[in-house]
């Protein structure tokens, strides 16, 4: 009769409700909502598919995957984005391992099996409490990505990466999708998310 209950507290069930975890997921959700709203108001772009991490199978799971279509005079182009939200919790070795995992995922064919395309931009958006911290973290991430690409002789992959520092409160202002706030790891020049390699 009724629903079964567990009569004792299980702290292990709360480990995923830390402040950092909740904030990460809130930023991720806001980013996906912002992408949806931005595409809705831009006739040349459509958001045709979106998936969040808990919907994705496999060993390598991006925080989010967004498939945009861009309509130009030359035709329609796919613009898939693997979004990764960086809260600055990973030091250099762990971050490099994260990037290496994404590279292997794309190069192995597993990405193509999961998303039916072999095209991808890997977009790392870092957050933090102060503008100085966010900018330093963005520069560090660009440096670490480029070091890894050089070590593996994959410098030509630099165009597949974008890194931005974002402010939580400004996620809905569309700057993430239309302004030059992104950086390739091999260039100090800001560009838009959808700028050609």
Predicted regions and their residues:
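Electrostatic, structured charged patches in enzyme active sites and in nucleic-acid/phosphate-binding
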Residues: 2-197
């Amino acid at each position: 009769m009724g629903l079964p209950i567990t009569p004792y507290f299980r702290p292990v069930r709360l480990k995923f409700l830390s402040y950092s975890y909740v904030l990460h997921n809130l930023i991720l959700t806001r980013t996906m909502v912002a992408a949806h709203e931005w595409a809705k108001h831009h006739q040349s772009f459509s958001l045709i598919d979106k998936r969040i991490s808990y919907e994705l199978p496999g060993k390598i799971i991006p925080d989010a995957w967004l498939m945009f279509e861009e309509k130009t005079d030359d035709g329609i182009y796919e613009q898939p984005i693997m979004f990764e939200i960086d809260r600055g919790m990973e030091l250099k070795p762990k971050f490099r391992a994260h990037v290496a995992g994404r590279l292997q995922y794309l190069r192995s064919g597993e990405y193509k099996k999961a998303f039916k395309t072999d095209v991808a931009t890997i977009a790392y958006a870092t957050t933090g409490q102060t503008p100085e911290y966010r900018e330093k973290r963005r520069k560090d991430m660009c440096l670490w990505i480029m070091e890894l690409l050089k070590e593996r002789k994959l410098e030509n992959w630099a165009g597949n990466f974008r890194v931005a520092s974002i402010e939580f409160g400004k996620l809905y202002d569309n700057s993430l999708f239309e302004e030059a706030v992104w950086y390739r790891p091999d260039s100090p020049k800001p560009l838009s998310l959808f700028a050609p390699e």
